[in-house]
Amino acid sequence: MKVSYISWAESCSRSDHTARELGGRSHMVYLPQFGSRAATIVFKYAGQWRMTARILREERPDAVFVMTPPVFAALPAFWYAWRRGARVVLDAHTAAFLHPRWKRFQWLQRMLCRRAATTLIHNQHQAALVEAMGAHATLVLDVPIIYPSVEPFARPATPVIAAVCSFNYDEPIAEILEAAAQVPEVHFFMTGNPKHLAPELKARMPANVTLTGFLSDEAYAGLVCGADAVMTLTTRDHTMLRAAYEAIYQGTPVIVSDWTLLRAAFDDGAVHVNNTAAAIAGAVRRVATNGEALRAGARRARDRKLQRWTQTRSAIAARLVVTSGGSLLGEKGKVRS
């Protein structure tokens, strides 16, 4: 069975790696020239709808996986499925349920979840939300990350923390910078577009923090693999941190926020913090002094995650078999292409 994976986004490694694991193709469908302003969003989505329709018409997949949000990305997939007898699987990220912009469209998310073969969900809390809608949920905590090419990272002589950020509203950026100032012996490489960083924070940037700006996939992979730890934090509960499992799959320790979800997801090779500057600085010092033990823990966690993904992939394929009546598994356990 042929699989296409649609994401209305500039980039999404989760979509790319999930598509790869299922033997399908990942497509980033995005028109950046329209931005995300209210005055232009209709034109942007209309253009992306046409692009999606063209991809599906050319590939003619038997199963279409769609990342939400935006929930509207699923509409052309369902239209195609209705006409071709295909199956649709939603990959619902945390923002699909919790972001203020998308809460007003929960009625549409609910309707589409109920019509999908299954909805891929990142944690038990959101799985319960989907099941309460009368829909089928498949728990996918994370997906194996394999970097096809890694650019060597020219690390300084000091310990290195890769602070993976997007400067979103749920990231404690001020606390991270304050913590960096408390551990001048450690260098922080902070990813993300600096234009989204508040000017007052940029004005008091510690000397041991480097804003990397945009990184190519190869350079980002080099940073994740070469750092002593990857730090990714959120003030929002029930949020899975993609950068953290990207790091664990490379055997790199992580510093993550102290939420129940993240304690369960990263139970080895990880330091959990309460998002205060003092706690973050303490976690960084722990990485600097106990790096080898944490790295061994990250490798153990990676092995367990790989085993769990094998089971999850089989569950997704089995669900598609049930809803399509066909055999989807190839010889290597991947969805047929």
Q: What residue ranges belong to the model's regions?
A:
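Donor nucleotide-sugar binding/catalytic pocket of nucleotide-sugar-dependent glycosyltransferases
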Residues: 13, 114-151
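Conserved donor-binding/catalytic core segment of Leloir-type glycosyltransferases
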Residues: 152-171, 177-183, 189
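Nucleotide-activated donor-binding/catalytic signature segment of Leloir-type glycosyltransferases, i.e.
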Residues: 198-218
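Short hydrophobic beta-strand element within catalytic cores of glycosyltransferases
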Residues: 229, 251-256
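Conserved acidic donor-binding segment of nucleotide-sugar-dependent glycosyltransferases
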Residues: 269-278, 284-292
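A charged, aromatic-enriched C-terminal amphipathic alpha-helix characteristic of glycosyltransferases
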Residues: 292-323
